[in-house]
Regions:
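Short, well-structured N-terminal submotif of metal-dependent ribonuclease cores
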Residues: 1-36, 45-62
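Active-site neighborhoods of divalent-metal-dependent phosphate/nucleic-acid chemistry enzymes
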Residues: 70-115
């Protein structure tokens, strides 16, 4: 049986913290959970703007310490996939935010199911998207 590998975007991580049942179920079923540097950057920026920065960083550190959680690398192959997705979405008139392109490209590159609460990822070809709470 193939391992269940998922990637969280920022919205899914936030939903997880809020106790979203669909996201929690997806994470419980996953053997490997990935985030990428873009997601981490968005989280850290959000923490800095909120009133619980220290506590939120501590919670994230605990999450990242799990042996099931890994950081997916962004490299030249990711950039090529980014360009292909962006070109496709432009041609369809359905662009998505730049950071979300990087997240989708990373999921595509590593064959990861993308867990999100953002429905616009459904417009991205060649990735499996599980939209929770959309």
């Amino acid at each position: 049986m193939e391992k269940i590998k998922v990637m969280l975007d920022t919205s899914a991580y936030s939903a997880f913290l809020r106790g979203n049942a669909e996201v929690n179920q997806a994470l419980q079923a996953a053997e490997e959970i990935y985030l990428n540097p873009v997601v981490l950057g968005e989280l850290y920026a959000g923490f800095a703007q909120g009133g619980r920065e220290k506590k939120n960083k501590e919670i994230l550190r605990e999450f990242l310490a799990s042996p099931r959680v890994q950081i997916a690398v962004i490299d030249e192959e990711t950039a090529e996939r980014y360009a292909a997705i962006l070109t496709y979405l432009w041609s369809k008139g359905t662009p998505i935010p730049t950071n979300d392109l990087w997240i989708a490209s990373t999921a595509m590159q590593h064959g990861l199911k993308l867990i999100t609460t953002d429905g616009h990822y459904r417009d991205v070809p060649q990735i499996i998207v599980e939209c929770c709470g959309v």
